[in-house]
Amino acid sequence: MAAAPSLTVTLKDDSQVLNDVVVIGYGSVKKSDLSGSVVAIKAEEMNRGAVTSPQELIQGKVPGLFVAPGNGQPGAGSTIRIRGGASLNASNDPLIVIDGIPTSNDAAPGTPNALATINPNDIETFTVLKDASATAIYGSRASNGVIIITTKKGSQGKVKITYSGSFAAKDPYQRVPTLGADEFRSTLLGQYAEGTAQGNAVRNILNVYPNQSTNWQDAIYQTGLSTDQNIAVSGKAGFLPYRVSFGYNNERGTLKTASYERYTGAINLSPKFFNDHLSVDINVKGTINNNRFADAGAVGAAAFFDPTKPMYTCLLYTSPS
């Protein structure tokens, strides 16, 4: 029996693009193999402009993620909900994970939460886990979803200095319509003529300050000003990639005496050892917040104050001698 002829087989190269990889609590998996609902937002996909808080970076970018602004106080934390609330009494805030470390998002009313204290210029990516499968990674505290934040790290190239700054101004866009001083006096005279107003009250208003006119809403509101300044230095010193950043944010509220000031600093070192088999990440972050709260009750009170009265009065007393 004759031997079979030899065969020459040539394999042709076939390049394929690898599937997306998603970093989760316990490692990395292919996006196609991950059963949970995950949305990853990179730096180039985030919102641009005068952004002063991390919530503003992803607002409107993630389906099912609801971001409601705070009470208007400068620096107030936003309310974040992933696919609505699940409890009437317990917290509905999602779990915030910063560089692999879970943090509490609880805060007193009107004060910044954990997410609001982060400098948005230090954030590299957001990953939002939106369904109950997140509890398999982080436990029951992730029942309201998870927001994973990865901050920027040192680069492998030359030293790079980055600066960004912004200034903004805002005015109260809506005020309560009220009567002016002359309209108020005319209304009282009409009520007195109809017998629905007491004569003594009408005489006091007409005679004590006959020409006084005060807009109480103008007295409590002001033009809100804000500035945000950030500088970062990144590079590699020998085998040590590093990134150092500083940020300053100052906001003056539209309600007088309301202000917020934030100082942030971050140091990131990411060396590798044993021929890149061992990676070490060292992150040091610090935040200083200074809040001055305005009396929010002044907003409602200004709509009911008498426009015929002055803001300040001076009483002169003569001594008996």
Label for each model-derived stretch:
Residues 1-267, 272-288, 296:
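Short, small/polar-rich motifs associated with maturation and membrane association
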